[in-house]
Amino acid sequence: MSSGVTPIPRSFHPNRRHLVAPRLIDPSGRRGPTPGRARGPTWRRTGYGFYVPSWVDATLVEQRILEMGALLPGHGGVTGWAALRWLGGSWFTGVRADGTALPVALATIDIRSRAGIVPCEERLDPEEITVHDGLRVTRALRSTLFQMRYADSLWDAVIVADMAAFSDLVLLHELWPYALAHSGMTGIPQAREAIGHSDENAWSPMEVVMRLIWTCTAGLPRPLTNRPVFDLHGQHIGTPDLLDVEAGVYGEYDGAMHLDGKRRLRDLVREDAFRRLGLEGVVMVAGESRDEVAARIVATRERALRHDNPRLWTIDQPAWWIPTETVAQRRALSEAERARLLARRSA
C-alpha cells in the first residue's frame, strides 16, 4: 500500500465487527494514516495521536468506549458504566437524561484529563482487570461499585446495581462484601446504602424508580419484583413489575411503548384478568411526581386491605415453571432457554 492510500481498517474484534480501532500515525500508511492524510478530511482524531476514518460513527456507544479505551497506557482499564456496557450491560447507554454523553472513566495513572474521559487513580489490583473482546476493562464488581459510588444520587446508585444484575453481571450477595472490603474509597457509604435497596429482578430503570417511591417515599413494605402470578389452577396470568403480596396490590410503569394500540389492548386485557382474580393495580407514567405516585400507591393499598378481596391468585409456581428471578437462576439457563424465557424483558 502506498503512503498516499488510506489503509482499509479491519474490524476490532470478531465479536465487535462493527467497531474500528483507533490507529497511530504511520509514515508508511500501512498501519495508520500518514501525517498528511491525518490532517485531511478522511480521518478523525480521537485523542493523543490516535485516528479513525472519518466515516466511523462516533455516536455509537461501543465505538466511543473503544476510542477512549485506546488512550490507556500499559496498565489499567475502562471502568464504570462503560465497562459494564462493554461486558454486556444493555441498560448502560452512556447518555444522561438530558441527552448529553457521559464521559468514559479510565482506571489508570499517568493519563491527562481531556474531553470524553475521566481519569481515576484509585488503588487498583491487577487481578481486577480483564480483557474482554480485546479491550482492557475492570471486572463487573469493580465497575458496578465504581458507578454506584460516583452516582449522582442514592436512587441512581440503586439503578446501577439493579441494571448490572439485569444483565447478570453481578450477584448482589457478592457486591455487599466487595463494598465492605473497599471501605476507604470515595462514595462507599452511598454504595452500601444502595445495595440494601437493590434487587436482582428489576427489568428497567423506571421500575426501580417506582419501587423506591413505593418503599422510600410512600414508606410501604418492599414489593416483589416481576414475580409471576398464577390462578389457582396453575395458569400464568401475568408478571407485574411490582407486587405487594400482603395487600394484593400490583404496580406497573407504563412507558411510551405502552401507548401503542396493540400493546395497550394487551395491557387492558391483563388488567381485567388481575382484577377478576382479586388484585388491584397502580400504574405510573412518565412525568408524574414522586409524591403523586406515592399517594396513589398508599390509597390503593388501603382500599385493597379494607375490601379484603377474595384471593383467586397465587405466586406459588407450578412444577413446570422455570424460575428466573435471580442472577444465579438466569446464569444457569441454556442459550435457548434464555432466548425463550427472558424475551419479555426490555433492553
Predicted regions and their residues:
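Short gly/ser-rich loop at a beta-strand->alpha-helix junction or flexible surface loop bordering the NTP-binding
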Residues: M1-T186, L305-A347
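Surface segments flanking catalytic/ligand-binding clefts of nucleic-acid enzymes
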Residues: S2-G4, I25-R30, A165-F166, V170-A347
